[in-house]
Amino acid sequence: MCAINKAYLLTKFYISANSCAFFVKSQRKWTSPDLSEDVAQKFLETASEMKFDASKQVLVHGSYLINMANADEQKREQAFNCFVDDLKRCERLGVGLYNFHPGSTASCTKEEGINNLAECINRAHEETKSVIIVTENMAGQGNCLGGTFDDFAALKSKIKNLDRWRVCLDTCHTFAAGYDIRTEESYKKVIDEFDEKVGAKYVSGWHLNDSKAPLGSNRDLHENIGLGFLGLEPFRLIMNDSRWDGIPLVLETPAKSPEQWKKEVELLRFMVGKSSDDVELMKESARLSNLGAASRKEHLNKFEKKEAKKDRKKKSKDGDQTTLLLRKKQKLGNAEVKSLDE
């Protein structure tokens, strides 16, 4: 049986979910064998048997190699061809939503990277028929795009066909990028900001992951739900937010076996209709928090050491600049270098 059909069987029968995500080819190779007619047909038959609407309940994940923000035209074209191949595979399978990472600016400015990305998305819309391109938010690491809602606002302004463009919000990435969603008040503030800058109606999927790293760490470190720095409350809020009804909510948490995902699906369903002061939910939240305490302490320690190192480097650099300025003053006289202080 093909891997795609296995994903459906695992999802439907074992972990009792009603949506899923998978790759339509190897996510770490530029080229893969064509999608055979036999595989495509088996997928369609499996979806029909399981009463899955692949156009709405599946959120395919794109290749990790794709970087269409790249300033290098040759590399960008290679990424684009891989991207379009993914989209066409989705259309053959009847899949309606394709999620991908926006990429890194590499040797160009953020504005140039967003322009490159938008141009490729617009071209991809022209070369495909129906699949909706879903851009995922990122943790703000390095030169990656998608770490701020402003990035998405800028990208959206350059997309010609907004009917076929959407956003996937990842809870871990959102938190790591500095958006605090741990309380009802802060969650509302973050979603309101996204709604104002991009539009909540453009969210067509969530990746549900706790975070091993603390707020604003810019680290993409997924943790099992309830064990990390997010805790259960953000997931309760998402599960009870009617704006997300009918869109895929996909787990990307660490799991040695599907049993872990099955438990998390059950936990997420348990949260529906529950208030923050529900006794059973509070007990489960405390239990999971205790289980993850050692890991959180370890990652917080790593984060604090990294931040302290950055502060020392900054102070050293500032000190070097001050020393250089004083030397210039000694050579030229204070009056002649007055502008250096301004």
Swiss-Prot record:
One of its GO terms (cellular component) is cytoplasm. Its main location: nucleus. It is found in: Nucleus. Pfam families: AP_endonuc_2. It is an enzyme of class 3 (hydrolase). Zn(2+) 1 binds at residues 61, 136. This is Apurinic-apyrimidinic endonuclease 1. It comes from Schizosaccharomyces pombe (strain 972 / ATCC 24843) (Fission yeast). The lineage of its organism: Eukaryota, Fungi, Dikarya, Ascomycota, Taphrinomycotina.
